Amino acid sequence: MKKFLSLMLCAALTLCAFAAHAENAELNIATNQYYALLERMEQFEQESGISITCEKSVDIMDTISTAYVIKNPDIDLFVFTAYDGLYTLKNMKYYTPLTDSAILQDAFQHVYPALRPVCTDDDTLMGWIIDASPMGMMVLTEYLDEWGMKSPETFDELLDECNEILAEGLLPEETGLLMQKYTQSGMMDLFMKYYIMTSLQEGRRLDFTDETFLHYVQRIKDELPAEEEPRMAFENIFMIPGASSAPSQMIQFVPRIFPEQNSAVETYVTIAVVNPYGKNQAAAIQFLEYCATHLTDGSYFIYDNLTEPIENPSMVAQLDELAEKIALLEQKADKERADEDTLRDLQEQYANMEQWRYFSSAEDIAYYQEMAKSLYVSEGSPLTYDDALQVLVQRYLNGAFDAETFAKECQNHVEMIYAEIGE
């Protein structure tokens, strides 16, 4: 942590030096993440003196491809979500290496290992993570407790519990089962997505002939309904939302598909890449160094050395106010019965509020560090749950072939992709 703080100081000194002669400095950014970047861009402008012009791009890969073809010098930095085409950009070698930035190189050592490949092309640091949002499962445990159930740890247990909840008619009004439809099609989509991500996250070659795959696709087809009754739902028992602004134990692993491996934690990453033809590359790198050293609560999703609990400022202010009132009453010489009652009430109130002092406790952060071993980021690779696989799923569910034939068809499809990308 001390080394990281020294990096922040180094970056601040660099920023001050840059600002001294940055009166006419500019930075031109093309992004499809404008509003997510807005506050950080404004802060950087104020501290650096660099003027930022931002092009809001609807189709960021079209913007990048056009800039590549014409060698556009008027865009210095591309900021976009990795799944929008980082894979393609790396194949094009369309980036400015960041290897000369000591600040970024040092900060990179603290990026969670599962996220480091996003920033690199082979061993070259070629981009910087601006934001990361992991997706996990959130479970309304109060309902499960009431029904004598526990949070499912495996995909089999998830199917078992969903089947039982429906069979027993346990769902309260205005409460759904899952965010996606609990149908053959809906659960095949969920299963296929996590089977692929978890296989790739572990570095395995996709194998749809695996017994685990055959077991689940057969079970989903045999046990789940083809359609779901319409239902007005304001909440769901099982949800897969994005994480909040800081680590929390409310976000859990999606139930395991493979017996000895946690499911992949799908993570949406905003990445920044410096245009090799940009005329303000130094300013672009300066901005990335600023992002790497000016941390937010969301930085806990990126850097593994951030372990201090994150306090809730408004709750801390209320606790401080209560502490003052308690101290005054404790110091009062001649306390009356009413004073003793008030003091006891304030102390109980303080104890209850103390459990909400932190947005993220040390336990929350430790829990996320375990989840972070399974982070998976799609970079727009062709190895995904693509249209062709979705068509095969529908054909399988419509009875075009059995589970084994379906698995072979899926395998034939991905083998063609492996051949195309030379793997």
Residue ranges of model-derived segments:
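Short, well-ordered beta-strand elements
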Residues: 23-34, 50-55, 77
